[in-house]
Amino acid sequence: ESDFGSSSIISDGGTIVMPYEPSVTLNDLKQSDGSIGQVSIDRVGLNCKVYEGATDSSMSKGAGHYSSSGLYTGNVGLFGHNRGNHPYFGKLKNVKVGDIVKYKTAIGTKTYKVTFVGAISYTDFSYLNEMGDNRITLITCIANQPSLRLCVQAVEIR
């Protein structure tokens, strides 16, 4: 049972109080260049802009935001190419659990710590489900493995 009005989630009889964060729209995040944010993982040198839609058009300029996922709160899902002419997620394969991910937007910056790095099926979208916290999920292809995707997931730290 969820009670979003009081910004808490009820689960198994206990209440987990979530920090109140107003809902965010695309217009709140849209920059003059069309991007909605910037994702970076300094340890591996990954830094790229984020555009709405996990489309070839978006991923030719940076990372593509999965439209059904959170924009700033919840589970923010990002897709990107790692080879070819636009390898914005090329360094994702070097990420390790514990690395820090930053997501900078017009309304603020969130900082996350990587909790999962692994290969998932290209049909497995469960890592983009809402988990009751703020997290970011980055997904890219794996070279010569067309049925797999590399998934990096990080949970917000404050």
Residue ranges and their predicted role:
Residues E1-R158:
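Solvent-exposed, non-transmembrane regions of membrane-associated and secreted proteins
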